[in-house]
C-alpha cells in the first residue's frame, strides 16, 4: 500500500494488552460532572439488583408453603402463599420503577458527558500546533469524534451500569447460595473456575481482535476521506486501479480483524451458556442425591445454624428449588459480566485515543508583545485607542514596567535562520532576507525547496531552530502568536470555505467587520460582480467547501477574506497555480489591489506572477542561491534564467 505523507502510522493492536487506566479517568470525570445523578443511579441499581435476587430466595419460602400445604391443605397455607405472591409483585414493581429511573438518568448523564467531552476535545484541538495536524491524518482525527466517542457512549450508557448491576447481583447470589448450602456452593465454584478460563482465553482473544478492528476501521475511514478529497487527482493520473488495490489491502485487514473478533465473540456466549446448563444439571443432581440420602448425607449451611442451632441438617426440596433458580440467575449474570469485556476493552482503547487528543500539549506561546489599536499624533507619537483608527501598534513591555508602542508597519527580516521539521533533516539553511514595508518578495524553487516553510516561520506555525526573525524590529518570538497572526493575511492555493453565507465567509477574516467593509473587500478582490449574480447574492449559502463555486470564484472569496482583515503583511502561497490562465487574469487583478501598500511574500509556480517583485529569492534545498530583481536575475543567466527560459522546471 502506498505511503501517505503526514500520516503517523500506528502499530497493530493484535497481541497487545488493553490499558484499562483510561476507564478510571472516565469514571472520575463522570462523578466530577454528575455526582448527584450518579449516586441516584447507583442507589437505583443496588435496589434493582436486590430486587433481582429476592424472587429466587422467595421461591424457597413459597416451596416450603407448598410442602406445608400438602400436609395442611390449601386453607392452611393460602394466606401465606397469597401474601408471598403480593410481596413478589411489589418487589418486581419496585425493581421496574428503579430500572426506569436509572435508565432515564443514565441517558441524560451519557449525552451530557459526551457533549462535554466533545467540547473539551474540540477546545483542546483548537490549541494544538500545526505540527500535530501535519503528522496525523484527518481520517484518524475524525475517528476520535465518531468511532471512539461511540464506544464511550456504549460504555457509559450500557456497559458500566450493566457491569455494576450484574456484579452486585453475582456477589449477592454467592452470599445467599453460601447461606443456603455449602456443598452445592462447591459446584458453583467449579462453574466459576470454568467460566473464568473461558473468559480469559476466548474473551481475551476476542477483545484483542476487537481492538485491532477499531484501528483498522479508522484506517479505512481515513483512506476513504483521502480518496474523496483527491478524486480529481486520482482520475487525472488514471490511478483508479491502484487506489482500489490500496483500499482492498486495508479493507482486507479490516475484514480479517472483524472476522476473527466475531468468530470468538460468537462462540463465547454459547460456551458460557452451556457451562451454565451443565452447572444447573450438576447442582440438581447433587441436590437430589442429598435429598434422597434421607439425611444420611446432611447439608452444611448457615441457614440450618439459624433455624436449628446446628449447621448440619437434611437438605430440603425448597432449598434445592431456590438454589437452582439462583444458579441459573448466577450463570446468566456472570455471562453478562463476561459479555461486557469486549465493549469495555474497545471503550478503553477509544478512551485512550480520546485522552491522547485531549492531553496533547497545546501550542506554546511565550510571547508578551501584543497588538493594539492606536492613534498617531502629527509628531508621530502613538497612544493606545479604544476605537478603530486604522492604525495598529505593538505594545512592548519594558523592564521598568512601562509600555513602549511600536507602529505596525510590516518590516520583516530574517537573520541566519535554520530550521528542520525533523532534527536529522534540516530544511532551511542560513536564510537571511529583508522585506521593507510595502515591498514584494517572491520565492521561487522546486517543490521541497523550503518556500512554504519560510512562510510557516513568519506565522510561527513552527519555531526556528537557529537565527532570528524581526518584525518591525521586534523578535518574532516575543510577539504573542494570536497577535502576530492577526497582523498577517494569507491566500492559499487550496481555498477553505466554511458552511455559511458568502458574507460570513468574507467576514471570517475580521469577525467584527461590517457588511459595508465586507462588500468593499469583495470589490477590491474583483469578487463583487460574480457574488451579485449568485441566487441570493451575499446571502447565498455555501456548503461542502464552496462546491457550488468555481475554483476561480473560491479564490476570489479567499482574496476578499484576506482584504477585509486589512493586514500590513500578506502571504500568497501559490495562489494562482491551480486555475486557468483566463481566470488568473481576474484573480491577479484582485491580488494586485490586495498587495498595494503591503509587505508581500509570494510563492508561485508561474514566474509571470512574480516578475514585478522588488526581490526574487531562488531557493534550492533550503538555501537561497540567487536573489535580486527579475531583470538582475535574467542578466545573471543563472538558475532563475534557466527556469524562466524553460531549460529547468520547477517540479
Where are the regions a protein language model picked out?
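Membrane-integrated ABC transporters
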Residues: 1-52, 67-87, 102-106, 110, ...
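Juxtamembrane helix-loop junctions of ABC transporter transmembrane domains
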Residues: 12-16, 51-67, 90-138, 142, ...
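Transmembrane helices of ABC transporter permease
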Residues: 33, 37-50, 91, 158-212, ...
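An intracellular "coupling" helix at the cytosolic face of ABC transporter transmembrane type-1 domains
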Residues: 35, 130-131, 147-156, 160, ...
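Transmembrane helix-loop-helix hairpins at lipid-water interfaces of multipass membrane proteins
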Residues: 38-101, 178-183, 285, 292-317
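Hydrophobic alpha-helical transmembrane segments of ABC transporter permease domains
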Residues: 43, 98, 102, 110, ...
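Helix-loop-helix
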Residues: 69-70, 176-190, 260, 264-352, ...
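ABC-type nucleotide-binding domain
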Residues: 74, 374-651
Amino acid at each position: 500500500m502506498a505511503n501517505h505523507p503526514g500520516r503517523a502510522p500506528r502499530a497493530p493492536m493484535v497481541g497487545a494488552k488493553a490499558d484499562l487506566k483510561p476507564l478510571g479517568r472516565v469514571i472520575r470525570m463522570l462523578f466530577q460532572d454528575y455526582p448527584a445523578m450518579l449516586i441516584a443511579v447507583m442507589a437505583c441499581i443496588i435496589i434493582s439488583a436486590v430486587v433481582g435476587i429476592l424472587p429466587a430466595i422467595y421461591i424457597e419460602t413459597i416451596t416450603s408453603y407448598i410442602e406445608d400445604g400438602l400436609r395442611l391443605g390449601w386453607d392452611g397455607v393460602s394466606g401465606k402463599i397469597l401474601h408471598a405472591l403480593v410481596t413478589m409483585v411489589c418487589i418486581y414493581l419496585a425493581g421496574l420503577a428503579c430500572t426506569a429511573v436509572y435508565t432515564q438518568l443514565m441517558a441524560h448523564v451519557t449525552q451530557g458527558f459526551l457533549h462535554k467531552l466533545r467540547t473539551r476535545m474540540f477546545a483542546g484541538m483548537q490549541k494544538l500546533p500545526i505540527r500535530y495536524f501535519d503528522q496525523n491524518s484527518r481520517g484518524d482525527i475524525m475517528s476520535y469524534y465518531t468511532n471512539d466517542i461511540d464506544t464511550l457512549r456504549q460504555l457509559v450508557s450500557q456497559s458500566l451500569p450493566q457491569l455494576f448491576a450484574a456484579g452486585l447481583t453475582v456477589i449477592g447470589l454467592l452470599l445467599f447460595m453460601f447461606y443456603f448450602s455449602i456443598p452445592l456452593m462447591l459446584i458453583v465454584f467449579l462453574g466459576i473456575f470454568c467460566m473464568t478460563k473461558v473468559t480469559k482465553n476466548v474473551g481475551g482473544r476476542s477483545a484483542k481482535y476487537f481492538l485491532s478492528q477499531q484501528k483498522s476501521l479508522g484506517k479505512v475511514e481515513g483512506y476513504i476521506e483521502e480518496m474523496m478529497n483527491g478524486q480529481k487527482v486520482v482520475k487525472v493520473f488514471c490511478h483508479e486501479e491502484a487506489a482500489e488495490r490500496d483500499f482492498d489491502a486495508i479493507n482486507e485487514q479490516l475484514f480479517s480483524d472483524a472476522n476473527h473478533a466475531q468468530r470468538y465473540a460468537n462462540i463465547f456466549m454459547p460456551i458460557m451458556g452451556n457451562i451454565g446448563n451443565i452447572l444447573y444439571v450438576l447442582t440438581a443432581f447433587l441436590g437430589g442425591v442429598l435429598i434422597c440420602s434421607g439425611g444420611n448425607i446432611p447439608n452444611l449451611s448457615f441457614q440450618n445454624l439459624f433455624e436449628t442451632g446446628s449447621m448440619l441438617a437434611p437438605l430440603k426440596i425448597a432449598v434445592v428449588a431456590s438454589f437452582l433458580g439462583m444458579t441459573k440467575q448466577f450463570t446468566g449474570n456472570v455471562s453478562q459480566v463476561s459479555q461486557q469485556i469486549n465493549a469495555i476493552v474497545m471503550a478503553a482503547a477509544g478512551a485512550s485515543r480520546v485522552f491522547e487528543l485531549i492531553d496533547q500539549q497545546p501550542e506554546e506561546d511565550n510571547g508578551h508583545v501584543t497588538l493594539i489599536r492606536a492613534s498617531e499624533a502629527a509628531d508621530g507619537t502613538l497612544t493606545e485607542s479604544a476605537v478603530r483608527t486604522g492604525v495598529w501598534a505593538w505594545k512592548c513591555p519594558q523592564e521598568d514596567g512601562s509600555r513602549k508602542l511600536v507602529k505596525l508597519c510590516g518590516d520583516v527580516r530574517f537573520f541566519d535562520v535554520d530550521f528542520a521539521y525533523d532534527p536529522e533533516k534540516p530544511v532551511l539553511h542560513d536564510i537571511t532576507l529583508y522585506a521593507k514595508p510595502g515591498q514584494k518578495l517572491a520565492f521561487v524553487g522546486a517543490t521541497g525547496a523550503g518556500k512554504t516553510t519560510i512562510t510557516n516561520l513568519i506565522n510561527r506555525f513552527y519555531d526556528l531552530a537557529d537565527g532570528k526573525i524581526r518584525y518591525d524590529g521586534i523578535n518574532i518570538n516575543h510577539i504573542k502568536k494570536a497577535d502576530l497572526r492577526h497582523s498577517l493575511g494569507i491566500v492559499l492555493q487550496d481555498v477553505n470555505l466554511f458552511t455559511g453565507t458568502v458574507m460570513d465567509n468574507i467576514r471570517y477574516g475580521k469577525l467584527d467587520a461590517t457588511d459595508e467593509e465586507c462588500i468593499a473587500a469583495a470589490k477590491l478582490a474583483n469578487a463583487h460582480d460574480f457574488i451579485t449574480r449568485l441566487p441570493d447574492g451575499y446571502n447565498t449559502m455555501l456548503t461542502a467547501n464552496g462546491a457550488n463555486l468555481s475554483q476561480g470564484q473560491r479564490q476570489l472569496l479567499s482574496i476578499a477574506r484576506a482584504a477585509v482583515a486589512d493586514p500590513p503583511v500578506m502571504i500568497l502561497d501559490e495562489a494562482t497555480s491551480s486555475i486557468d490562465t483566463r481566470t488568473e487574469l481576474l484573480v491577479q487583478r484582485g491580488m494586485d489591489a490586495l498587495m498595494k501598500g503591503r509587505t508581500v511574500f509570494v510563492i508561485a509556480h508561474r514566474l509571470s506572477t512574480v516578475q514585478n517583485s522588488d526581490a526574487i529569492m531562488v531557493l534550492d534545498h533550503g538555501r537561497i542561491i540567487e536573489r535580486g530583481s527579475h531583470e538582475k536575475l535574467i542578466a545573471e543567466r543563472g538558475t532563475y534564467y534557466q527556469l524562466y527560459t524553460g531549460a529547468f522546471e520547477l517540479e
